[in-house]
């Protein structure tokens, strides 16, 4: 049983993590936002990325997610002001935003702050939820 199931119970979306990243070919990855550690852990353990750095400024969350692979480098810092010390093949902004939570200025700030830290042909992904449902 994988740790996502243990941590989150019967989370069908979480257990699909391997499938979501099956074609992932990047080696040096920066993740903005730790969450429950599922994405960094999948990238390091399942995809064998040589570098997985994670930026998060929530010490309580960092302390809670202490089960992830020791070679994942968690950096306590604000994602909007952090300056990387290396270049990455892939930067994933995983800050759990809906379209009402983020401004064009915030997006521009992220792009301007991180674009110079992408390797040639590197990519930066900023997924944003555009639709939500309420009952």
State the predicted function of each range.
Residues 1-28, 37, 41:
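Class I S-adenosylmethionine
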Residues 18-22, 40, 62, 80, ...:
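Short amphipathic alpha-helical segments and helix-helix/interface helices
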Residues 97-135:
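C-terminal substrate-binding/active-site "lid" region of AdoMet-derived donor-dependent transferases
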Residues 58-85, 90, 95-99:
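S-adenosyl-L-methionine
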Residues 31-33:
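Class I SAM-dependent methyltransferase core
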Residues 43-46:
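Aromatic pocket-lining residues of Rossmann-like dinucleotide-binding sites
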Residues 27, 50, 89:
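Conserved acidic residues
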Residues 51-56:
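Conserved SAM-binding motif I beta-strand of class I
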